[in-house]
């Protein structure tokens, strides 16, 4: 296997037993932001817990049919994908990997899977990202275009070829 070859992955449905892992994953995606903002270390865990609970509740209430999937790689839980299949589009609500699994091709492979499904169904794919976040470059390379940017969030859409 070459160094550039993507690491294989698997998907499985998330269960209640995965909540601790999902919190740890969520916290890993916010650490740099909180450190850069000077957020006191002692308050981070509590703050992250509240934010994680708010995000989980929002997604569950607003997107009750969304699929919550745990990404596995090499026998370990590596991340999660939350995907809502609306009648007129696919919505990637969240895609996140633990730091040790980033930059290994897993996210790209997952996104390509979603795009292949959308292309087959002739549906667009939507997602939101923080403006300027590293993954935005990946989304653009895969054909996503920005349709809204409020300075904090960017909404991106991918459209299948006709």
Go through each PLM region and give its residues.
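Ligand-binding grooves and catalytic loops that recognize ribose/phosphate and carbohydrate rings
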Residues: 126, 130-137, 141-142, 147-158
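Conserved acetyl-CoA-binding loop-helix of GNAT-fold acetyltransferases
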Residues: 103-116, 137-141
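Surface-exposed loop and edge beta-strand positions of immunoglobulin-like domains
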Residues: 12-14, 128
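Short phosphate-binding/catalytic loops that engage adenosine nucleotides
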Residues: 106, 123, 144
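Conserved GNAT acetyl-CoA-binding A-motif
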Residues: 89, 118-130
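Acetyl-CoA-dependent GNAT
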Residues: 5, 9, 16-17, 24-93, ...
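Active-site acidic-Proline motif in GNAT/NAT acetyltransferases
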Residues: 98-104, 131
